């Protein structure tokens, strides 16, 4: 029924394909077609699967313990693709709670919170030439366009596109964003997180479904088609990935089975400044959960690179050096980068890290964290400060544009102007520049040339 080697590596914190064990999978059991549901809930007294196929529990479907390792499973006959479901647990305290499947491939459109049965197999890719020639771009131009697929452009009723504010679908974006990215000379499109998230305003940085491409823009195979189209136009796709924390919404990972499966047992370590919950990456099963998520998107969606959000919070507890190194999370990063360099050697691994921790892009074998690139956040902040100043006073602050060279060769850096610098009223790049509009235009031109030639 299950691959015992995968189960062993799952509990050992080294599993790259935990999604083959857990979640909802079509199978034929004793001549009957249906779906096998499996979940990891070590603290639950009992577990059920509830959904459209059993009237949300009116006909109970109690799951069986597979072993003593906290795994529950059940085969349910007659379940169809797109059927909605959840797992129902009796907690150690005797409460009954319903949870979305952490390993679900597809989710109900918000504000709904159920998981959906989905068949990931069958999409025919047309990007074999792209994949064959793909590299990590160490010795060729790398020009990345960062965008949220939801906020980049929305439909307008006045133009006959749909309701005002309605999102474009993955397929519709093929004819919208890809021509723009290509025309502007970008080599890669970096999409802000696509893993399922409940609140539009988070832009995807507070996730619930780490295997579920958000249903806001369509179905998983439509996302595959979008990425396939990017590749056929010579555009790589980088995906923002959020390994540090997750939302505390009641249907999600927080206190998944009534206990702390994914979160810290220690209250003082548990909650983040973003009103979310930190992953406890000292737990092997959590390591396997996130390792497998990255591998899943690389395999099934042909993602060309991952930009890892808030790496400083993985290096130090809460991103604070005074709180000490987050040993569990750093071990996870080393395992991740080591595994990915072996199994997906041309996929870029990019750290968004604001610390001065050494060796972020040094190979794991040389006692580094193993990333391919690190965002140079210090360069971005210093450069923008310099260009905001009146030119009369810049002679006194030349260190803003020279200091970066003092550390530039210590890591393999990417220079960036990210969404963090233009949100919450911080102004667009052009409006950060000194002077009147004509002055600002000239400054922006100088800024981008400086960035390219740095």
Task: Map each language-model feature to its residues.
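Conserved alpha/beta catalytic core and glycan-binding cleft of carbohydrate-active enzymes
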Residues: 111, 304, 316-454
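The feature marks proteins involved in alpha-glucan
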Residues: 1-32, 36, 66-146, 151-165, ...
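Short beta-strand elements bearing conserved aromatic residues within extracellular beta-rich modules
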Residues: 47-49, 85
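Short proline/glycine-enriched turn/loop motifs at strand-loop junctions of beta-rich domains
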Residues: 40-47
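Short, acidic Ser/Thr/Gly-rich low-complexity loop/linker segments typical of extracellular
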Residues: 58-70, 382
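Substrate-binding/active-site clefts of carbohydrate-active enzymes
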Residues: 130-139, 148-303, 307-325
